[in-house]
Amino acid sequence: MSSALEAVLAVLVDAGEPIHWTVIQDRALRAGYLDPFVEPDVRGAVLRALRALVADGLVVRTETGVYALA
């Protein structure tokens, strides 16, 4: 288990291409990076993490809802 920030980064590194935030969320859950019993608002956590990563310049939004590593 990891923080939402770490989970989003791990999924994007593994993907190696821009992917939609819902796919990021799904892959993070399937890989066990996020636990819905520990973080009940998984959707909110993923979206907050993406906003923070974009603000920090680590992730870019390529189109509506689609993100990639910077």
Question: What is each PLM-predicted segment?
Answer:
Residues 29-47:
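Short, positively charged loop/turn segments that connect secondary-structure elements
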Residues 23-27:
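A short acidic, leucine-rich amphipathic alpha-helix
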Residues 1-20, 51:
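Positively charged, polyanion-binding regions of nucleic-acid-associated proteins
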Residues 1-2, 17-22, 39-43, 60:
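Alpha-helix N-cap/helix-initiation sites
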Residues 64-70:
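Short, cationic-aromatic polyanion-contact patches
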Residues 54-62:
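A short, conserved structural fragment
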